[in-house]
Every structure is written in structure tokens, then in C-alpha cells.
From Swiss-Prot:
Provenance organism: Danio rerio (Zebrafish)
Its biological purpose: Component of the cytosolic iron-sulfur protein assembly (CIA) complex, a multiprotein complex that mediates the incorporation of iron-sulfur cluster into extramitochondrial Fe/S proteins.
Pfam families attached to this UniProt entry: Fe_hyd_lg_C (PF02906), Fe_hyd_SSU (PF02256)
The keyword 4Fe-4S is annotated on this UniProt entry: yes
Transmembrane region(s): none
InterPro entries referenced in this protein's UniProt entry, alphabetically: Cytosolic_Fe-S_CAF (IPR050340), Fe_hydrogenase (IPR009016), Fe_hydrogenase_lsu_C (IPR004108), Fe_hydrogenase_ssu (IPR003149)
Keywords per UniProt: 4Fe-4S, Iron, Iron-sulfur, Metal-binding
Record protein name field: Cytosolic Fe-S cluster assembly factor narfl
Residues where [4Fe-4S] cluster 2 binds: C124, C180, C329, C333
Top-level division of the source organism's lineage: Eukaryota
Keyword Iron applies: yes
Amino acid sequence: MAVIFRSISGCITSAESVLITQQSHEELYRVLRHNKQVSSTEQKVVVVSVSPQSRASLAAHYGIGSSEVARKLTSFLKHLGVHHVFDTAFSRSFSLIESQREFLQRFSQREADKKALPMLASACPGWICYAEKTHGEFILPYISTTRSPQQIMGSLVKGYFASQKGVSPQMIYHVTVMPCYDKKLEASRPDFYLSEHETREVDCVITSGEVLKMLEEEKVSLRDVQPAPLDTMFSNVCGEELLGHAGSGSGGYLHHIYKHAAKQLFGVDVDELTYKTMKNKDFQEVTLEKDGQVLLKFAAVYGFRNIQNLVQKLKRGKSPYHFVEVMACPSGCLNGGGQLKPSADQSNKELLQQVEEVYRSEHPSVPEDDSQVAELYQSWLESVGEEKARQLLHTQYHAVEKTANGLSIKW
């Protein structure tokens, strides 16, 4: 248990353990089997949304490119009976745009609201779980309300996609493939349950490792699978290649918010970000200075020891940052607990390096320049910052009282 839930603070409740065990590749198989036994009108539309980090993990394992993994995985999943395979880099574009917008808003309110800054990233569910359980009301106002790419994809699939297809959200079975077990907990949050339709926005989360298990159970090597065309509806596609985002392997939040804020607030065009390593490689700073004055100070803080230091600084009123990209796992999402493990003749460090190389090989796209994203802001959300966008692309957090079983996690 401690290996699986390595990023969560304190204890795992019994209820959370149950929620997680309900989500596995066996559940996906169960739905696919059920679809084959019922009439077409009773079948669920099965959608699988794959994270770029999971693609990179599988690509490093098989020694093939990330976009090739996407095409082959699309083929494999559709052969099993999946109807659509999407890419969460697409929903991440919304997450990055909303995070940029939210940061500018918080920056403008920093004098009136002492907890507007630093804005703390919200895409990591291990970090959110820790914040809610351990620091509650103190820390939550600092955390960005922008949903993670997984949960924005949940909104897209059970909202826009369902309406476009003329299907009730409860007749869609939405699976995500993630680098992290804690994403199963995130999908189970009551905030992401559509009570009107009695369905979750994300029904099941499986890890990169569980996808490998599926391939092994089917006695298939991804190398040997005939590729299929990529679904273009919710994917960042250029020709036959998937596009990624610049910045870290955890989504590039610091990179995109920093460049956007520098331009919008101070008229500064930043080409390259210069990272300064602090106590260790999992704690880095980026500073924008002009005429000797610090205009922006951002940090990337990964792993719980660094996170604990950050929280203590906040509590003492000593944090110098405007924004912090916070991730529970050392080295971030590419090193998530649900990623593939190294082979016998490979170290963790070597594997991580390969995964990072694959991830960075994807051509980066700029979220604001994505015409499909811009079109959806108009047709689905009725433009950036409007009430519908706040409802479907943002969330809230809840301080949790400390009642749990004894599954204590050590970092």
C-alpha cells in the first residue's frame, strides 16, 4: 500500500481504499464485455483519454516514439471495443489558459487579499490530498481553483462530447490513463460527480503500468500493433504527430504562467526561462528582474520534503514567491507511482532520463494559439472567464478532519 500511495500525506481512509480498488483495468474489461452482450442502444460509449506522461512511459519501455505509441495504443484499445481515444494534452491547454487567467486575477488582488499569492498549482492530487488533510483552512486559499487536465477532460467528455453525440452522460464510460495512482482518488471526489445524471465525469482511472498489464494479458507487444489514425476531436494533432507543451514534465504550469504574466503585466517577452537550482534539483526558482527590482519570482517544488519546507515558509510569512508549481512526486509526474518500472539492467535514473527525452521530443504547442481550443471557448464555454467556464473548468477544496485508518505513508 505504501508503494502505491507514496505521495499522499498521513493516512488513507478505508473509504478511499475502496474507491481506488473499484478503479482498475478489470473494470474497463467488464464494461467492454457488457457492451458485447447487449443491444447497441444499451451499449455505453467507451472513451479513453491518455496522458502525455503515460505515453512517454510506454514509449521509453518499447523504444518507440510518443506519437507512434498514441497511434498503436489507439489501435489496441479500439480492437478491444473502445470507441474513442483522446489526448489529455488537449484538455491541458484549457488548464494552462485558465491558470494564466487566474494568476493575473490573483496578482491584481494581492494587496487586498493576503492569500491571493503565492498561487499554488492544483494539478497534483497527492499534493491536494495532503493540503486538505494536513493544513486545511490555512493552505487552501492559496491553491489554484483551475481543474487538472484529467478533470477538464471529464468536463469535455461528459459535457460537450455527450451533447454533440446526443448521448446521456451516464451512457458514456470515460477512462483516463495516468502516471499516478492518486488520480483515482481525484476522479472519485464528490465535486466531480454529476448528480443530475448520476455519473462521474471520469468513471475509471488506470495507470500506465496497468496499460502494460493489459497488453501483457492480451499477449501483445505494442511494437507489433498496426497503428490506427489518431482521433482528432480532443487531441493536439499536427498531421500524424501529437503536440505537447513546453516546460516541465508535470504540465508546464510554471513555464506558461511565467511567460504570460511577464508579457501581460510588465510587457516583457521571455524567450527562455533560466532556472536556478536551490537545495536540490526538485526545488528550482525563476526570477524576472528589471532595473534591479524583482518583478516575478516563481518556483517549482517537487517531493514532500520540499513541499513541507514551502508550507512552513508560508506559515511564517517568509515565502517570496508569486507562483509555485507543486508536485508530490520527486522529479514530478514523469516519475509518478503509476509509471512503468525499470528493467532488470536499468536504474530508475536511467529510465527517467529516457522518459524525459521522449516527453520533450513532442513539438510544443501554445495553448492560446490553438484554434480548436479557442472555438470551444466560444461555442461550449461562451468565452474565457465567463460563468460557464468557471463552473466547468474550476473546482473547490475542502479541509478534511483527521480521521483515518493506520495506513501511514512515509516519505
